[in-house]
Design a protein with these regions (language model features):
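Bacterial extracytoplasmic/cell-wall-associated proteins, especially those involved in peptidoglycan
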Residues: 9-10, 14-208
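Positively charged, low-complexity/disordered segments
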Residues: 1-8
Length: 208
């Protein structure tokens, strides 16, 4: 299972995260076929048409959606998706996702694909091959990482495909959250730094 997550495999791309019932002696082939059938039932022809119109591949969409899911709850899916799409847009001044859910930032190891999955798989951070680190560290790789970091649900996939953001997120390149679950969006780095201070103040008050 860990290996499948590491390589951003077809299993991650088409494994719909739902509750399934299987017989105890069922086969792996049937497990996978069931996962694929569920994904294909949810991903409509209209969604495929929208994907084609945008020039995205299914693996790219699911990779983006996996970051949306890890960074947001359903209420913020579209806003976070819009921020990431703004960063990925042609001519963007910030062409990297810079998501702490897959990065070298150790302080966010509680929800960090590289620290929680990749590093243990290879025996430690220092043992991660350079090509793997380069492919999944969103602070160093330009554009999308090599594959998904989780199996996103339908809500995250829809948001990644056709986000419907609030006004505050439409032109944003940055966001930060506080421990109360508030999201702060910004267009400029200066605005983002101010939001970080606001979020830090909220967090400090909660801890006092």
């Amino acid at each position: 299972e860990i290996h499948e997550r590491l390589v951003g495999s077809e299993m991650c791309i088409r494994d719909s995260p739902e509750t399934y019932e299987f017989l105890k002696d069922d086969t792996v082939h049937n497990y996978v076929a069931t996962f694929y059938a569920q994904f294909d039932a949810q991903f409509t022809a209209e969604m495929y048409a929208a994907l084609k119109k945008q020039g995205m591949t299914l693996p790219e969409l699911v990779t983006l959606a996996s970051f949306v899911q890890e960074e947001a709850g359903n209420s913020q899916d579209s806003n976070v998706a819009q921020v990431f799409r703004n960063r990925l847009a042609e001519g963007s001044p910030y062409p990297r996702l810079q998501s702490n859910t897959s990065s070298h930032v150790q302080s966010d190891a509680d929800n960090n694909y590289l620290w929680n999955w990749v590093a243990p798989y290879y025996g430690g951070w220092d043992d991660i091959p350079e090509n793997i680190l380069a492919a999944y560290d969103t602070y160093s790789c330009t554009g999308l990482p090599a594959g998904p970091i989780s199996n996103p649900g339908l809500a995250a996939i829809k948001a990644a495909l056709e986000p419907q953001p609030d006004e505050e997120a439409k032109n944003a390149y940055f966001f930060v959250t506080d421990l109360k679950g508030n999201y702060y969006y910004a267009h400029t780095l200066a605005e983002h730094n101010a939001n970080c201070k606001t979020a830090a103040a909220v967090n400090k008050n909660l801890k006092n």
